[in-house]
């Protein structure tokens, strides 16, 4: 292990002990904000310190095993050689894990997200596919114990959505879903197709971190135009008699957001403002990430919405992620929300890119 990395890990281990002491201090416990911030820091470095302690134990075991190889007894020397090999393997595996754990953290990883699915080319079939994608993400969220709140929806004439936006709330939502932004393509025979021909349709997905506590997104009141209108869709008679839906236009950028899901105009406005903050923050971050990705020739994590990232081929039961050349013949399970294999592979590739970038400096 590099001395520079070991030095950082030693400092983290010291900080971990310091935090443990602070979190049992009555003065800290009585200060809610300080206690929350320190608890968050403790939770963040806990897995790193645990892994480092295992690594230190493996180093110690390796030293003891090496000493056994100098023993006068042949059986002891053989046992020492075997234990040294085992300790060496553990050291290498734990050192690799520590490198990943010490990679720069994306400040957005712990954030909730706004999920936006928009039908692209393909007419009615694209809208139906947008509905399928939204259902897939909703099922994945359900499996992970996350909550999905609808923000706005424009339904397709024959099912699905022309556009749907929802807020996904839970632990580490952005860290799992951040690689889903981009163009998703479907190849299948539509229900309305009498000749049995395969059609190709597309949707774009945007994953935007909720912007609270994520940076200085300053939105001036004079830069906003706020319109209210009557909600459409579900909600009963009450919805149709009140101007509860809210549309907000950010004049400098032309970004428009709306929320019509809540009955209260005040709640709709608050949620629309949150979505606007997320969109502006997302645009700011994507510009920086696109520049970094271009420098590293990296596709995973570039966040380019026009980039075709995945194809869902129904006749072949195949899903292909084009960024990492991963093909899985598990389409039915994937569209039912079983996304862990794909998302895990994307995260591994992203971390490999980060490690390669660190190695260049």
UniProtKB/Swiss-Prot annotation:
<keyword id="KW-0488">Methylation</keyword>
<dbReference type="Pfam" id="PF03462">
    <property type="entry name" value="PCRF"/>
</dbReference>
<dbReference type="InterPro" id="IPR004373">
    <property type="entry name" value="RF-1"/>
</dbReference>
<dbReference type="InterPro" id="IPR050057">
    <property type="entry name" value="Prokaryotic/Mito_RF"/>
</dbReference>
<dbReference type="InterPro" id="IPR005139">
    <property type="entry name" value="PCRF"/>
</dbReference>
<dbReference type="GO" id="GO:0016149">
    <property type="term" value="F:translation release factor activity, codon specific"/>
</dbReference>
<comment type="function">
    <text>Peptide chain release factor 1 directs the termination of translation in response to the peptide chain termination codons UAG and UAA.</text>
</comment>
<dbReference type="GO" id="GO:0005737">
    <property type="term" value="C:cytoplasm"/>
</dbReference>
<dbReference type="Pfam" id="PF00472">
    <property type="entry name" value="RF-1"/>
</dbReference>
<comment type="similarity">
    <text>Belongs to the prokaryotic/mitochondrial release factor family.</text>
</comment>
<protein>
    <recommendedName>
        <fullName>Peptide chain release factor 1</fullName>
    </recommendedName>
</protein>
<keyword id="KW-0963">Cytoplasm</keyword>
<keyword id="KW-0648">Protein biosynthesis</keyword>
<feature type="modified residue" description="N5-methylglutamine">
    <location>
        <position position="237"/>
    </location>
</feature>
<dbReference type="InterPro" id="IPR045853">
    <property type="entry name" value="Pep_chain_release_fac_I_sf"/>
</dbReference>
<dbReference type="InterPro" id="IPR000352">
    <property type="entry name" value="Pep_chain_release_fac_I"/>
</dbReference>
């Amino acid at each position: 292990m590099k001395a520079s990395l070991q030095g950082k890990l030693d400092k983290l281990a010291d900080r971990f002990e310091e935090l443990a002491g602070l979190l049992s201090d009555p003065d800290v416990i009585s200060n809610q904000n300080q206690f929350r911030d320190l608890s968050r820091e403790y939770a963040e470095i806990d897995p790193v310190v645990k892994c480092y302690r295992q690594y230190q134990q493996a180093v110690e075991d390796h030293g003891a095993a090496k000493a056994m190889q100098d023993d006068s007894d042949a059986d002891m020397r053989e046992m020492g050689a075997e234990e040294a090999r085992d300790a060496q393997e553990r050291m290498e595996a734990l050192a690799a894990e520590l490198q990943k754990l010490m990679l720069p953290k994306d400040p957005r990883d712990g954030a909730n997200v706004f999920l936006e699915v928009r039908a692209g080319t393909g007419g009615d079939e694209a809208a139906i596919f947008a509905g399928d994608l939204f259902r897939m993400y909703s099922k994945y969220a359900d499996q992970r114990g996350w909550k999905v709140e609808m923000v706005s929806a424009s339904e397709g004439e024959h099912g699905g959505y022309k556009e749907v936006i929802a807020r996904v709330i839970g632990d580490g939502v952005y860290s799992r879903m951040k690689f889903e932004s981009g163009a998703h393509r479907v190849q299948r025979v539509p229900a309305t197709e009498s000749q049995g021909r395969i059609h190709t349709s597309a949707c774009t997905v945007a994953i935007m971190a909720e912007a609270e506590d994520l940076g200085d997104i300053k939105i001036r009141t004079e830069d906003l135009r706020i319109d209210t209108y009557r909600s459409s869709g579900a909600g009963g008679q009450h919805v149709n008699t009140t101007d509860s839906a809210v549309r907000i236009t950010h004049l400098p950028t032309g970004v428009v957001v709306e929320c019509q899901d809540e009955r209260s105009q005040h709640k709709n406005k608050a949620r629309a403002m949150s979505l606007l903050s997320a969109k502006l923050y997302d645009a700011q971050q994507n510009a920086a990430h696109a520049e970094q990705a271009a420098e590293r020739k990296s596709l995973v994590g570039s966040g380019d919405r026009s980039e075709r990232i995945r194809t869902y081929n129904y006749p072949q039961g195949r899903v292909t992620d084009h960024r990492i050349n991963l093909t899985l013949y598990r389409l039915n399970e994937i569209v039912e929300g079983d996304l862990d294999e794909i998302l895990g592979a994307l995260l591994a590739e992203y971390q490999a890119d980060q490690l390669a970038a660190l190695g260049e400096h």
